[in-house]
Amino acid sequence: MSQKSFKKERDPSILILDFGSQYSELIARRIRETNVFSLVVSNCISIEDINDINPKGIILSGGPNSVYEQNAPKCDKKIFNLGIPILGICYGMQLMVKELGGSVISATKKAEYGRAPINIDQESDLLRDVEDKSIMWMSHGDSINCLPDGFNKIAHTENTLHAAISNDIKKLFGVQFHPEVVHSEFGMKIIKNFVYNISCCEADWTTETYIEETIPRIREQVGNKKVLLALSGGVDSSTLAFLLNKAIGNQLTCMFIDQGFMRKGEPEFLMNFFDKKFHIKVEYINARERFIAKLKGITDPEQKRKIIGEEFIRVFEEESNRLGPFQYLAQGTLYPDVIESAGTNIDPKTGERIAVKIKSHHNVGGLPKDLQFKLVEPLRKLFKDEVRKVGGALGLPDEIIKRHPFPGPGLAIRILGEVNNEKLDCLRDADWIVRDEIKKAGLYNDIWQAFAVLLPVKTVGVMGDKRTYAWPIVLRCVSSEDGMTADWSKIPFKILERIANRIVNEVISVNRVVYDITSKPPGTIEWE
């Protein structure tokens, strides 16, 4: 078959036109939670491309602009005459109203931010089974002043006259609030009403159908050629390894580069798990001394990241040449990576990057642009939670699927200041105790991340009637849904006490343990 044939994938049932909203990805995730496939595309998508995709429904996202700004983002006005159901959210609703002859007024004292109860004015397919006075999440300045012909007001709030509108004949709808946000009580109900009742989508986007559709597509793309995968042990690369192994078997070679900054026992665990237990070919590359030598005397965190990234590139080049030749490079690129790296450079037909570039390898630096690989990125349209489901369906155990996120530079950026083997050994032991006690307490799966940080100072202590001068360890445990925001975890004091006691008694050169209770924002999850 031709190259074009294997690139033909499932078309999205719902298209999301992105006008710069911070919630565009969230809209897509919420729709996929209804088992309906959706993609985020540029607001500049052409009518021809929309007709080619033939979606069952279109959502116009929110955005930070005012529709009256000189360079405010727009879409082709003909979109409203396609006969395809459209839901405008916040800015998307305001744009629809303005383009169809209504009017929007700038914010004055009636701007709305946060929770607000909506009052339902009349029945509508969009608000079916949504309770009156239910709470919705508002975040807008401008408001609709006058509706276009054919539209009705179906809900309002205390400060917003047109909180929801509809044109039932043309199936055009709008909401001033954000149904995709968790704070909106009946937000998912509104999304389901639009997806199922109005757009008539089928709930056929499942983990099983994704795997069934993807495996033959991988086989068709790769043929009998060899594929190389840089394995990190995280959920993305591990899921990809299982998926590729199921699709092409021995044509896959995984390369695990041990740079010396992994957690205690992880290199041994990964080699045993993939190579011995599941018979997935993994080439182990011990590059510990190379990496630690490059970091000698380096204290700046950005320099550390850059050096680790550059050294990873050199090792990767050397080993791929030694093991190859390989025609394909497999990457665990996810859909948020595609959106964030492409910006507006997204193919409107597929939602994929127009100019494909090899992304940074787990935050440790990009691979060389001149590497002569073709890319295999079967996860590129999935979100993180979907990848976990695929991994589970393929047989990955919970210890991989539910593993806490771990930065590409590893422990090197959890040691503040210069990195050396003594500090690495110290931090590995302390970090293992943190995770061990969190798991014993049954809290591991309830926490986004739990780890230890080694500070580059020494503190005074007393141990065995003797004065000590040793390093302090910081405990960092946070709760989060996606890592974008996070709150410090309220670990019971008895567990914190047990962790601290074990660390100062079992870890050499540590005499103090402190707990970081900073949320994100203003802080970040990692210290470097």
UniProtKB/Swiss-Prot annotation:
CDD domains (alphabetical): GATase1_GMP_Synthase, GMP_synthase_C
Positions of the Glutamine amidotransferase type-1 domain: 13-204
Residues binding ATP: S232, G233, G234, V235, D236, S237, S238
UniProt keyword ATP-binding present: yes
Disulfide bonds: none
Pathway terms, separated by semicolons: Purine metabolism; GMP biosynthesis; GMP from XMP (L-Gln route): step 1/1
Superkingdom as given in the UniProt entry: Bacteria
A GO-annotated cellular component: cytosol
Keyword ATP-binding attributed: yes
EC identifiers of the protein: 6.3.5.2
Alphabetized NCBIfam families for the sequence: guaA_Cterm (TIGR00884), guaA_Nterm (TIGR00888), PRK00074.1 (NF000848)
Name by which UniProt lists this protein: GMP synthase [glutamine-hydrolyzing]
Source organism per UniProt: Prochlorococcus marinus (strain MIT 9301)
Gene: guaA
